[in-house]
Amino acid sequence: MNDRQIKIVCSALLHDIGKIVYRSGVKINHSDGGYEFLKNEIGLNDRDILDAVRCHHAVPLSKATLDDDSVAYITYIADNIASAGDRRENENGEPGFAINTPLESVFNLLNNNNQKLYYKPAMLDDSGDFINCPSEQKEEFTSGYYSAVKEKFRNLLTTIDFSKPVEQYVNSLLELIEGLCTYIPSSTSTKEVADISLFDHSKLTAAFAGCIYTYLKANGISDYKTELFKNSEKFYDKKAFMLYSLDISGIQKFIYTINIQGALKTLRARSFYLEIFMEHILDELLDKLELSRANIIYTGGGHCYLIPVSYT
């Protein structure tokens, strides 16, 4: 990826960081809150990223004075597409927001289920000792918890030098947001089902943003304002990306055709080999397609899904 594309992906990953700021008790809308946090507390001075965070919604974007090829327009459209795909209306919900609501299980409504299972407020534990299984106990977030998450973001984001875009920073940022936001709901609207995490929404937005940039570049489109903002309804119908599936056939035969002696060790070794082999294939694909690991939706068991650019 080139420097500009790295900035675009980073902007998309950070576009909703203001939700952490707002839920920690800072009474400012999440767009401005994210902008102020990154600029004043992190010391980030990259105009592209700051504009994208502050103007990723229609109203502030329409009032802002930006270049026609501003990164903010890509973040705006990518956020809209991701939001359309990961939010469902709660039929019994009343208008408003419940900022302390916990993340619900995606299995609550799957296959016509009608369950009420919730994840506890938690960060991913490097030790692996804690497994956050959803339960009927609804443990809500507190402003203190969000303040702790904000503090961790402050400490870790300051270690990334955004003035020198490096592709590895994308992976570091992706891992950081995964660790802190996997169990934080993206939307706390009482009219929506809160079963999509802030991490998954941010990752999906980054995946779309990377594809859209490459699509526009391939088609010689430099006026992002007209293409993505003024004519956004037309762009939604364009095939700028696709869902791609890859499968390594015959893995069961490869794994289980073994001798009895040392069977467990051989099973582990072959499973690990397949996992590394698939990761290598994905890294090669992403490198050729000039995309980031945000575009990987799922990988495991010799199978994967990713979102690449569509050039048709």
Task: Go through the PLM ranges and name each one.
Residues 244-253:
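Catalytic-site or vestigial catalytic-site microsegments of nucleotide-handling domains
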Residues 30-34, 197-205, 267-278:
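Phosphate/oxyanion-binding active-site loops and adjacent basic polyanion-contact surfaces
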